[in-house]
Amino acid sequence: MVSKKSVKRGLITGLIGISIYSLGMHPAQAAPSPHTPVSSDPSYKAETSVTYDPNIKSDQYGLYSKAFTGTGKVNETKEKAEKKSPAKAPYSIKSVIGSDDRTRVTNTTAYPYRAIVHISSSIGSCTGWMIGPKTVATAGHCIYDTSSGSFAGTATVSPGRNGTSYPYGSVKSTRYFIPSGWRSGNTNYDYGAIELSEPIGNTVGYFGYSYTTSSLVGTTVTISGYPGDKTAGTQWQHSGPIAISETYKLQYAMDTYGGQSGSPVFEQSSSRTNCSGPCSLAVHTNGVYGGSSYNRGTRITKEVFDNLTNWKNSAQ
């Protein structure tokens, strides 16, 4: 039998609990994901889910977005060589490790090199890579300046640029995308995308990209882009194995330099057959820092994969 005192104490305890709750002690809400998309376009509404079209494949190892070669039709223009300082990376840009083993890409009209783009904006000079007809993947610091808290002005994007030669001309940016985590300068979220004014990807093609939770140590990859220590607008590459495979970063000893930020870290002949061609595993972001002897790129995680896919889809 329950005593009257016990009932009374229970009622008082309940009333106190209700009073405290009503004074603002509400259940804690989950913090927004640092991968939540942010755009330079105020009208942009971030997707809360992702749609995988038939070009997205999956297997027991992960997800894959298929590559596309494009038509390759050249529309060459000659322009004055532009010299602009590389965009400031969050850490060291002096990323040549030992001897410089980069080699110049002399035929930038060959796929996939024509799908690698030179980016020039108010932030500086960078590299990017096509992931769809109108979408370029790049580093977050190439399009959003954390020191000023602002996006870059309109960028000029030149696929397959080769010095003063622009085999496919140049196109302008229309808007930018980054994850919210990059606004605070957290390098785990140093990635983004550029939407273009024209579907140049139909001509130059675009890269596949993939997500996997498996270790990528030993995987042979290539980094190709537009370094600031070489003749302006020339593309250079270096291949080698991934040395360290982390949750958010991949580390490697391939030589890079400022201006190559945003370059694809990709498998040339992908063992990931669902990519159907060159397959990017990360976005190159920075050089040696923090006691490591390796350069680094932001790894394509499930969240990065979904953001790139949504940004690509929103441009079509």
UniProtKB/Swiss-Prot annotation:
Tell me the Gene Ontology biological-process terms attached to this UniProt entry. proteolysis
Disulphides: 126-142, 275-279
* Entry EC no(s): 3.4.21.19
Instruction: Write out the coiled-coil annotation as residue ranges.
Output: none
Q: What is this protein called?
A: Glutamyl endopeptidase
Q: Which residues get removed as pro-piece?
A: 31-94
Source organism per UniProt: Bacillus licheniformis (strain ATCC 14580 / DSM 13 / JCM 2505 / CCUG 7422 / NBRC 12200 / NCIMB 9375 / NCTC 10341 / NRRL NRS-1264 / Gibson 46)
Recorded hits in SUPFAM superfamilies, A to Z, give:
Trypsin-like serine proteases
- Leader sequence range is 1-30
Per UniProt, the enzyme's principal EC class comes to hydrolase
